[in-house]
Amino acid sequence: MYNSVGIVKSHESDGESSLDIEFHDVAVHHALHLANKDNLSLAALSPKVLALASTSQGGKLIVNYFSSGDVNKEWTVEMMEGEAVTGVAAGDNWVAVTTSTSHLRIFSAGGIQREVIMTPASLVSLVGAGERLMVAWQGSQQELSYSLYRVRLTGLVPLTSSPQPLPLSPDSELYWLGFSDSLTACSADTGGWVRALDSRTGLWHPVINTRDHTRGRSDFHYIVR
């Protein structure tokens, strides 16, 4: 996993698994090296939270909360029997997970579960930044939909009245979903188009076609947030 905060890398050596977490700004936190005994394969990283999860049934969500400098608060939650984590996201003071039982669970950065809601369809992407959380779903007829939320200490505040269509270029797939530095929701597809959501109108506006700025067929742009 790579974003504007840092990198989470998984290593396999001599039958042992480990995780290395590096921060672009060492003032945020020093690098971490963790044994991966729980087969953690999902990660989300914000300036205040590192969230790791396993995708096995009854798997774990493990969170490091960088509450005060190098003083970490670590907590763990085990999913219910038959429930597996399918996605994880983190913001300033919260962690969100989607699960195989169609649950969206919201936790405070300190480990308190604030809310659980049912999700309408199969998860495609789960992203967070600041107080914003966006979820993309696989809808009917292979169309994608999204829901946008503000995450408060008391729970979720919907910013869309219901799941809304997520536009894509013809014959393309969703390539990236995330937020700009100003917390504007953005998307990119394999057709090369990057779009930004106007939260006032609910309309997606084209920002750039990255294919206009590549020289060869194998060139591509990697979006970082």
Give short role names for the model-derived ranges.
Residues 2-5, 29-48, 79-90, 120-130, ...:
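Repeated scaffold domains used in trafficking and secretory/extracellular systems
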Residues 61-62, 69-119, 125:
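Secondary-structure-rich domain cores
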